[in-house]
Amino acid sequence: QYMLDTTLNDLNKYPLKLSDLCVMTCNLNDAPEKVVWASSPELRHDDLPNVGLQGDSYYRPMQIQGEWLPYISKVMAIDPSGKGSNETSYVVTGLLNGNIYVLDAGGFSAGYTEHVLNKLTQIAKKHKVNKILIEDNFGQGMFEVLLKPYLIKDYKCTTELIRQTTNKHRRILDTLEPLISQHRIIVDAEVIKRDYDLTN
């Protein structure tokens, strides 16, 4: 009788898998022309904290090919905290050759305070983002109005309000699943380490 790996059955139930991400050390300003994904055992990131399903893991690229080129675009997305206890969260991404590089991500529990607004501005400045996308939860653009004076003072940058009407989990699946399953999302290893340290 064959011994079945029951963890594979669990993994097949869920469309988002850590193993479909590429995890490497990303640069602030440039990225390789091509990143080749694979999930061979020798490429597994055993040094990274893993809170995914049993049997799921992070993997290094199999190959990095071509020259390192500047990102064609860098975007920061902000999801302001709502009325409950959730955080103001952000992510910074770079785009090159159809790949999205996750360069930074985090959150602040202090809501819309001066500290949070200043920190977000400094993060945008550090990464030299071209645009800041702000999810307009229900504040009629309030967060954008609060953030703009900090941007005018320290880092002039375009902002854009994004209004969402669909369920957040559905949006995550519809948007991320095609990109992740095609191994188009490449995450900086430090982002994973820091996220784990801050939430555990």
Please place each PLM-identified region on the residue numbering:
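Conserved beta-strand -> loop -> alpha-helix junction used to position metal-binding or nucleic-acid-contacting
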Residues: 153-182
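RNase H-like, metal-dependent nuclease domains and their acidic two-metal-ion catalytic environment used
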Residues: 1-162, 188-200
